[in-house]
Design a protein with these regions (language model features):
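N-terminal periplasmic accessory domains that precede
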Residues: 64-67, 86-89, 98-101, 117-122, ...
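Outer-membrane beta-barrel "beta-signal"
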Residues: 439-441, 605-617
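Gram-negative outer-membrane beta-barrel transporters
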Residues: 360-369, 475-555, 580-584, 592, ...
């Protein structure tokens, strides 16, 4: 049998298996990404996925980028190994169209080419859960949320004094240490988390063994909280990420150079937030203030300096009446960025004052309606109004069967980098997205979503031969994204076996000119089988199939289109307690040593193994 035929045959077997005896009651999941307040995942019409700390540990994910690429509707491409430049596409849309948050603090870096977050620099050691809300969310969050929101929630302290320590070692001389210690009583909470992850790596550019491109990531997170009384509480949150990465640049002939032993970059990102909460009966007030400071320096044939600062303030008023909720929010954002290339500095900045109103109505015990409206007043761009209308219906005649739909509008303001390199005397304007999704799901067993999104006034770039730099501008025309997501989980609790799978098909991922976007796979299949014992041992096998995917080969003139897809990766996982409060995790990745290039010309991880010993107290 053809190997790809065998792999694709897993789709019907894993996606559509049903067994009425396999009904398992799961613990409720609480999220904050849908409307900025805590709620059950059942209390929103939005399409939400949650990756838990348990799943991260079981799969051995080292970064957020690695964790989300196994979610339906999301694809990720890496330009090399750990810490190398990474792009992620939610439903085919660009990285800068997804808002990334850490405990509510904005991580999107305005100094990047799209205003995107560096998911490759977000390690998983301190994560409690990752919330992913797909579809336009600008009617709540404003800019950079037209594809969705990824909110990373870090660990919270338990009662008394608790902590953990973990050490990792693996292929490519990868080593890591992470630790946390926390305290909690009736009034005070404190949690300090720190991690270091290093690797000697492999060549970012093919061939993989040309030389080593290393990476170092240092992360510290501090959370403090004080509860004055049952109604009033204050929280402080600080996060810092410092990285150093070696990469491969271009030679004198403008070709990728796998033997480049000079090009490197470092970054220093600091986020600080203060939150005050007041709650009495059915009313809650949230005050939020945060700052983000982003510094990046790239050293290759020239020196590039990137600087950005974000100041954000918000006030939320939440009113609960019965099973319904109304939220009135006010926001103020100040975004400022500088881009310097060989001593030539350019600037981009703007102010945004926003107001939004969100309502959830439980019409009866089976039908939920959610409406959002937001208005943003800019000092630099044309003001924007966005909205969302959603409905979800539970079918009592078939318990566990839910249908729903959402229609939304969204926008993405230019990043400070895009503003800095725009055409002279030309004012960029935000891109505008509108779209809808329709979904049906039956318990865990089957979840089907169809989506259709269109973006106008997208950003594009031309190369200026005089300055050897890109110029950003708005384009006329409409980009189109249509696709289907199918996912399923099937449990055999008596045997301790869990089957999971998801499949994504993109019908359209077209640019404004009708051509297809590069680096998006038309088909993606993720499948896994996991086995659990009563002694908390876990072992599993995981596979990912990437279908047709295209990229460009710039090694000759004119550049030509190349195929980079049609391959399957297999991974093995093992987790078990080895002593009291001590666990061992072993993860074997790409076990058949498949050679592939997610980004044409760049290498990918070969057969590799990693082990982690963790202790908690």
């Amino acid at each position: 049998m053809n190997p790809n035929t065998m792999r694709l045959s897993l789709i019907p077997a894993l996606l559509f298996a049903t067994n009425l005896l396999a009904d398992t009651t799961l613990e409720p999941i609480t999220i904050v990404s849908s409307n900025k307040t805590e709620q059950s995942v059942q209390e929103t019409t939005s399409n939400v996925e949650v990756i838990t700390a348990e799943e991260i540990k079981e799969r051995g994910y080292q970064s957020v980028a690695e964790a989300i690429e196994h979610i339906a509707g999301i694809s990720v491409v890496h330009s090399g190994g750990l810490g190398q430049q990474t792009s992620f596409f939610v439903r085919g849309m660009n990285s800068g169209q997804t808002l990334v948050l850490l405990d509510g603090m904005r991580l999107n870096d305005p100094s990047t080419i799209e205003g995107s977050a560096f998911l490759e620099n977000l390690t998983t050691a301190n994560i409690q859960q990752i919330e992913i809300v797909k579809g336009g969310q600008s009617s709540i969050w404003g800019s950079n949320a037209s594809a969705g929101v990824i909110n990373i929630i870090t660990k919270t302290p338990e009662e008394g004094v608790h902590g953990s320590l973990a050490a990792t070692y693996g292929s490519y001389a990868t080593r890591g240490v992470d630790a946390d210690i926390g305290y909690k009583d009736e009034k005070f909470t404190a949690l300090l988390l720190a991690s270091v992850l290093e690797t000697d790596g492999f060549s970012a550019v093919v061939p993989r063994d040309a030389e080593e491109d290393g990476y170092t990531n240092k992360n510290a997170n501090l959370k403090l909280g004080y509860r004055f009384d049952p109604n009033n509480a204050l929280m402080l949150n600080y996060n810092r990420i410092k990285t150093d990465v070696e990469y491969d640049g271009y030679n004198d002939y403008f070709l990728l150079d796998p033997n480049d032993d000079y090009s490197h970059a470092d970054s220093d990102q600091k986020n600080l937030a203060a939150d005050y909460r007041f709650k009495k009966e059915h009313y809650r007030l949230d005050l939020h203030a945060s700052t983000g400071d982003y510094k990046r320096d790239a050293y290759d044939s020239a020196l590039g300096n990137y600087r950005a600062k974000i100041k954000e303030y918000s006030l939320l008023n939440t009113f609960e009446y019965g099973a319904n909720k109304t939220i009135l929010g006010l926001e103020y954002k100040d975004i400022d960025g500088t881009y310097t290339y060989d001593s030539d500095s350019k600037f981009g900045s703007y102010l945004d004052k926003g107001i939004f109103l969100s309502n959830t109505y439980l019409i009866n015990q089976t039908t939920l309606i959610e409406t959002n409206f937001r208005y943003d007043d800019y000092d630099t761009f044309k003001n924007k109004a966005t909205y969302k209308i959603g409905i979800k219906h539970d079918h009592p005649s078939m318990p566990g069967f839910v249908t729903g739909a959402n229609y939304n509008t969204a926008y993405d303001a230019p990043s400070s980098y895009q503003m800095a390199i725009s055409l002279p005397d030309t004012l960029l304007k935000p891109s505008y997205t509108k779209g809808y999704e329709i979904y049906a799901r039956y318990k865990e067993w089957l979840n089907i979503t169809y989506f259709d999104h269109k973006t106008e006034d997208s950003f594009d770039y031309d190369f200026d031969p005089d300055t050897y730099q890109s110029i950003c501008y708005n384009v006329e025309g409409t980009s189109k994204f249509k696709g289907l997501e199918i996912s399923s989980t099937y449990r055999l609790p008596d045997l301790g076996v869990v089957f999971s799978a998801n499949y994504t098909h993109l019908f359209k991922f077209e640019k404004y000119d009708g051509s297809e976007f590069f680096r998006r796979p038309k088909d993606t299949l993720n499948a896994s089988v996991d086995y659990y014992t009563d002694s908390n041992m876990h072992c599993g096998i995981e596979a990912q199939y990437i279908g047709n995917r295209k990229d460009m080969d710039f090694s000759s003139w004119p550049a030509s289109e190349v195929a980079t897809g049609n391959y399957t990766l297999w991974h093995l996982h093992f987790n078990a307690p080895i002593a009291k409060d001590t666990d061992l995790s072993i993860h074997a990745k790409n076990i058949f040593d498949k050679a592939y290039q997610p980004v044409y010309g760049y290498a990918a991880e070969g057969r590799a193994a990693y082990g982690t010993i963790s202790y908690r107290f």
